[in-house]
A protein has these predicted regions:
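Compact, glycine-rich, soluble single-domain proteins
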Residues: 1-125
Length: 125
């Protein structure tokens, strides 16, 4: 299964490190329902952004994912604030957004760790 990642981003972590990311938009109900079902892996530092939606699932997935819960997109600096991180979410889970989150980003597992989680994800395009 191959995905087209067409949103270049950079995540700024607590330590100040900048991690380059390649994201794709999950805009439709179908995008959200299917997601990474059946995928055998996700490329390092790649993921899908669901800008709206206070829940995500890993049903029928074969692999774990990291979930960055994001706040509202800020058009002035082209970024999403990261509200929290759920690392290595196992398959067959249903997740609900924490307070303050309006969406989520499913990303390759191990991209971030909790002590150095991202604070901000900024679009580069």
């Amino acid at each position: 299964m191959s995905f087209k990642y067409d949103i270049p981003c950079v995540a700024t972590t607590r330590s100040g490190a900048e991690v380059p990311l390649s994201l794709r938009a999950g805009k439709t109900f179908r995008d959200k329902a299917i997601g990474y079902m059946g995928a055998r892996s996700i490329e390092k530092s790649c993921g899908t952004v669901y800008a709206r939606g206070r829940s995500l699932h890993t049903l029928f997935m074969r692999i774990p994912v990291d979930v960055c819960w994001i706040g509202r997109f800020d058009p002035s600096n082209q970024s999403w604030p990261v509200v929290s991180l759920d690392a290595s979410v196992a398959p067959w889970r249903i997740l609900f957004a924490p307070r303050g989150a309006v969406g989520g980003i499913e990303i390759a597992p191990g991209t971030f760790t909790e002590p150095d989680r991202p604070l901000l994800i900024r679009r580069l395009d």
